[in-house]
Regions:
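Anionic-ligand binding patches
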Residues: 1-128
Length: 128
């Protein structure tokens, strides 16, 4: 018997999904578009209860957090991209790393922006 948890996170700006950047130019473009603006971070989560290889129960949910970034200079963006940090992250930034200096406000769950809304996951499992 086991519980399977799957999750993925996206960044949304003006209705457009920003996934992981394809290259450094894409990362710079994403960060420039986020600079000085508020965007949303969504994490979709699926929970599956499996017994003897059969799914017994399942539920899905999502969490949304509003994130506002300060205005960034081209040099700040270039230096951050050169660090390699944004290349494997939706929206080309990781709030838990170097990009923290670019965040001016968060409305919602910080851990959702990191990639897993852990409090919500815990409470969903408790009700599962």
């Amino acid at each position: 018997n086991c519980l399977v948890i799957g999750a993925d996170t996206i960044v949304v700006l003006d209705g457009k999904i920003l996934g992981k950047p394809s290259d450094e130019a894409d990362a710079r473009a994403m960060l420039a578009s986020l600079s000085g603006r508020t965007h949303q971070v969504y994490t979709g989560v699926a929970l599956f209860s499996v017994k003897e290889g059969i799914i017994e129960k399942k539920t899905t949910f999502h969490e949304c957090t509003d994130v506002t970034m300060v205005s960034m200079t081209e040099k700040e963006i270039a230096d951050y991209v050169a660090s390699g940090d944004p290349m494997d992250k939706a929206g080309a930034y990781g709030i838990q790393g170097l990009a923290a200096i670019f965040i001016s406000e968060i409305k919602g769950d910080y851990y959702n922006v990191v990639g897993l809304p852990i409090s919500r996951v815990y409470h969903e499992i408790e009700q599962f």
